[in-house]
């Protein structure tokens, strides 16, 4: 006999609760969803498939933000679209808060105008570049300037 999986899931959601953000359970262990342990101290983790699903969800959110705020980004070539997505994913797009990629007014204007060297220079002179370091930032600057990701 096979158990009723739908009924079990409903019962567990009632008993455990469903929390869609990380929280500490009654014993202080980091948990998410319906009692899913993510606390590394107890061996908690998420499987790669869940990580990929979260990444897909985040990328779709970033695309929606960019489509609404700067629809011209879709006219960029593939590499420069990837850079815009990467930077927005990394820094966020938060018009009502400082620190997001939306604050890069000169760089965004350079991208929109096809002034690739200016866009790269704008990235290099930013706080973001200093914070993440050249190892992470320089490949994106070069990609903006050349339209190629170098390995």
What residues fall within each predicted segment?
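Surface-exposed patches in mature extracellular/periplasmic domains of secreted proteins
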Residues: 20-23, 67-80
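Alpha-helix N-capping/helix-start residues
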Residues: 5-6, 48, 75-78
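Mid-chain, well-packed structural core segment of small domains
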Residues: 73-102
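Long, amphipathic alpha-helical surface segments
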Residues: 1-21, 36-40, 50-59, 63-67, ...
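Structural recognition of the beta-strand scaffold that forms the well-ordered cores
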Residues: 11, 31-33, 83-88, 118
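Helix-turn-helix-type domain boundary/helix-start signal
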Residues: 44-45, 74, 109
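Substrate-binding/active-site groove segments that recognize
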Residues: 24-43
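Residues that flank catalytic or metal-binding motifs in active/ligand-binding sites
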Residues: 8, 26-28, 80
């Amino acid at each position: 006999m096979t158990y009723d999986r739908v009924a079990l899931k409903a019962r567990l959601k009632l008993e455990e609760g469903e929390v869609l953000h990380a929280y500490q359970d009654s014993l202080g262990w980091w948990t998410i969803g319906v009692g899913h342990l993510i606390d590394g101290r107890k061996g908690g983790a998420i499987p790669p498939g869940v990580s990929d699903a979260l990444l897909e969800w985040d990328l779709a959110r970033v695309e929606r933000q960019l489509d609404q705020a700067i629809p011209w980004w879709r006219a960029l070539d593939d590499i420069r679209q990837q850079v815009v997505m990467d930077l927005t994913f990394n820094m966020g797009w938060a018009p009502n808060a400082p620190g997001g990629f939306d604050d890069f007014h000169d760089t965004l204007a350079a991208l929109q105008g096809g002034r690739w060297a200016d866009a790269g220079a704008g990235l290099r002179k930013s706080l973001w570049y200093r914070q993440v370091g050249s190892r992470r930032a320089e490949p994106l600057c070069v990609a903006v300037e050349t339209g190629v990701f170098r390995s």
